[in-house]
Amino acid sequence: MTKHYDYIAIGGGSGGIASINRAASYGKKCAIIEAKHLGGTCVNVGCVPKKVMFYGAQVAEAINSYAPAYGFDVEVKKFDYAKLVESRQAYIGRIHTSYNNVLAKNNVDVFNGFARFKDTKTIEVSYADGSTELVTADHILIATGGRPSIPAVKGAEYGIDSNGVFALNELPKRVAVVGAGYIAVELAGVLNSLGSETHLFVRQHAPLRNQDPLIVETLVEVLAQDGIQLHTKALPEEVVKNADGSLTLKLQDGRETTVDTLIWAIGREPATDVINLEVTGVKTNSRGQIIVDKYQNTNVPGIYAVGDIIEGGIELTPVAVAAGRRLSERLFNNKPNEHLDYNLVPTVVFSHPPIGTVGLTEPQAIEQYGEENVKVYKSSFTAMYTAVTEHRQPCRMKLVCVGKEEKIVGLHGIGFGVDEMIQGFAVAIKMGATKADFDNTVAIHPTGSEEFVTMR
C-alpha cells in the first residue's frame, strides 16, 4: 500500500531537514528521502569537514608561525594527517546520529533511497538492492542541493573535485587548486597551512573578484606572504598523468605545473537532472536551477524548492535552513506571508585569515546610489595576535555608507577573528544602522572588532 504524507522532502541536507523538522513540530506527517548520508553537502563534504580542517590548519599556524614569539619551543615530531581525518569523520558520525535521533523524535520517516518523480504528487524511491516503492504527499519540497562541476578539458578525470578532498587519506606534497571562488581559496589555505606546496590557479587577475576590492587586494597580499603560489590568467588546457603518478597541469598559454594532486573547484551545478523533474512541469532555467517566487513556490502547486538549486539563490547552508523553516511556517503554521528576505545575508570565507562581509561592496554601492552619495570608511592594522611575532598579518576593514544619514549598506573585513565578528554587525545593518549608531557604541579594547566602531 502506498504511503501518504502531508510533506516530503527530496534531499536530506540542511534545508530539507530543517523544513521537515519544523513541519513535524506542528504535527504533520513527514518524510525525507536521501540517497546518501543525512546532512547533505554541508555535513559530509562541505562546511563541517572543511571547518574541522580549517581549525587543524589554525593549530598548525599557531605552532609553526606564532608559538616561538610567545615563548613556546615546540618540536613537532610529525603531523598525522590520518588522525585529523579520523577525528573529523568521528565528529561527522556524531552529527549523523543527532540528525537521526531528532528525526525519530519528530516521527519523521527516513527513506534511504533515490527519489524520482512519477507525477506531481507521487515519488518512486529506489533502493540499493534494486527494489522500489511509491510514496505520495500533499506538499513536496525539492532540496537536492548541488554537485561540483568538472571542466571539459583533456585529462580532467585525473583530478578530483572538492568533494574528493575529503576522501584523501594522506596530505599531498604538492597540490594544485583550480578555481577562484571561496571553495578554492579555503582549500588552498588549509592545505598550505598543513604543509602542502600549494598552487592556486584563477582565470582572471585574482580570486574572489566579487568581494570588495580592499578584500581582494589584501587576500592576494596574504597569499603571497603565506607561500601560496597564485597563477593568474590561468586557462587549463590539459592534465597529463606522468609515469611516477604525478600530474602536470598545462595551461593554454604554455605554462606547466607538476603536482601530486589536482583539485577542481570551479563551481557547482544543481542536482535537478536526476529526479525526473520533467514529468512535473516544474520550470527550470538553462542551468537546471528551479525557478521559484519569494515564497519558494515553483510554478506547480504543492511543489517547492530551497537551497543551492534555486535560480537567484545564495548557495549557503544557513540560507537553505532559514528558507526551509520559513516555508514550513507558511504552509503549516498559518503564517501566509512568511518568507526569507535574501537581502543583507552575511557571509564568511574561511581563508587564512578569514573574510567576513555583509551588504554591498563599494563598487556596488556606487552603481546603485551614485558616487556622490557614497562615503567609505577604512581601517588597516596588524592583528594583535600576530603583531608580537615575526609573522605579522594584516587586518583591513571597510564601512560603505550612503546618504546624508550615512546608512551603512556594506561592511567588509579580512583578518584574524573576522569570521566571529560579522554576525553581530549583520544584525545591526539589517536593522538599518547608521555610521552615527556605530560611533555611539563604546568600543571593546583591545579587539579587532573595535575598529568597526571607531573609524573616522
Where is each model-derived feature located?
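Beta1/beta-strand and adjacent pyrophosphate-binding region of the FAD-binding site
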Residues: 2-13, 171-181
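Glycine-rich flavin
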Residues: 2-5, 21-28, 33-171, 204-208, ...
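Flexible, glycine-rich terminal cap/loop adjacent to redox cofactors
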Residues: 8-15, 19-36, 41, 48, ...
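Short hydrophobic core segments
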Residues: 8-10, 115, 134-145, 177-178, ...
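Glycine-rich dinucleotide-binding loop and its adjacent helix/turn
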Residues: 47, 142-197, 229, 278-280, ...
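A Rossmann-like FAD-binding core segment of flavoenzymes
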Residues: 109, 116-128, 135, 194-294, ...
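FAD-site-proximal beta/loop scaffold in flavoenzymes
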Residues: 157-173, 256-334
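A conserved FAD-binding loop/helix module that cradles the flavin
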Residues: 306-366, 437, 445-456
